[in-house]
Amino acid sequence: MNSRTLEIRRAALSAGLLALVLLVVAGIYLGWSRGFREEPQPAWVFESAESRFKYGSIGAEHDAGVPYWIFYVLPRVFPEKFRQDGKVAPGGYAALGVAWEQGQELPVGFTRKTIGFARVANNCAACHTTSYRTSPDSNPVFVVGGPGHTVNIENFFRLLIDCARDPRFNADILMAEIDRVTDLDIIDRLLYRFVIIPITKKRLLEREAQFAWIYRSDFPDWGRGRDDGMNLTRYFMIRAPMDDAFGPADIPAVWNLGKYHAETGQLPNYAGDTHDVHSVMVDSALGVLGAAPANKADFLAQVKWLQDYLSNLPPPKYPFPIDAARAAAGKPVFDAHCAACHASPRTGTRLPLAEVGTDKGRLDTWNKDAAIKANRIVAGMGIDRRGLVEEDLPGYKIPFLDGIWLRGPYLHNGSVPTLRDLLEPAADRPKAFWRGYDVFDPVKVGFVTEGEGAKQVGTRMDTTQRGSGNQGHEFGTTLGRADKEALVEYLKTL
């Protein structure tokens, strides 16, 4: 073999190796670009603090995100799964009772972010945004930081699993529907068909075992505006075995969190089960992520921003006229019958169950052992926080009453529809009512819970069911009618 031929072969080999290297590099880049490349959200999301709270990512797209185009077409492929039986409420995701601003592609609390491909996840606003209307014909007002009394969280959890279990959740059917609404390029089409759809189905079905308890026939539905938060922590964070504990609670308001002062014994959460607001923010955000954060520094920065924002977020002002004279008459009634708990050093501390007498289901879902395990898991992530209180829970926290007019239904489990009903003995309170309707009742102070409108969108609250008892807190029940009405008028001012 002459030197010329050898040089040609060497050149060809070098060119071939170079081409192979370039091909490998291109493949790696393509895989990174289409699978992992993270893009910032659009600038409009961050134009205001409120917009960021509503639509800003907290990092949940990494592990809990649903591919955007799958999320988009699920209501088209499975329309029957998005409807409540016998209801004429809107279909699609609106049927879940989410707050949805006109002109937005996604509901409040649903975030869109590209990590290789566009994904949809949730943030805190999905549960902590209140919708109210001043009349059936008026447009909704959305109040960030308020309790999401209309949202049906349990149905959302079930919905994703139920869709994944359906034989129609396959590449042929989903891709046919995706093709009707968008024009993916060839690479994305192949990724969706052979990678994204199969993996999404697999991961949703993997959640089924962890969510088995929400399918139990002996557990009542949570209904709109409630969740079983401590059981979610037990089954997802510490992977506890399923037991019979059941304690649904109203989604709380999270405005004005700066009012809590841990050094004086004021504890957040319904049962005072967490040492301070920072710990609540960390644990709640971890719950939304569903896994350890992909980027711990970014996660903690998001938590700090949320805590600062919510600590300084004021409660909403009452939107209807207030009878000033009646409210003034209600102030001494409040001072005599309510202030010792709700406007004193006791506020934010625990009241023993024997003293308040309310439903104990929420207390039964948490204990010292669970707190120790949860604290150990978070510490293992390298996250520093004071954490959950490592003791059994003796009672419920005495709540602050800021913005109390918009926090119905009342008691920790939402078993009393209005403030006026709360001033009646337990035996005289409504035994059942519709919850999740957003038309406000300015007379009784709460939401309208009866009538055709409430029936068509609401879920039925039956206070004889487990975890939903309306007993207890029989304070002010012996007041005269005039004093009760004056007290309710005063509470509108808080």
What does each of the following model-derived ranges do?
Residues M1-I8:
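N-terminal Lys/Arg-rich, disordered targeting/topogenic segments
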Residues R9-L18, L23-L494:
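Periplasmic c-type cytochrome electron-transfer domains
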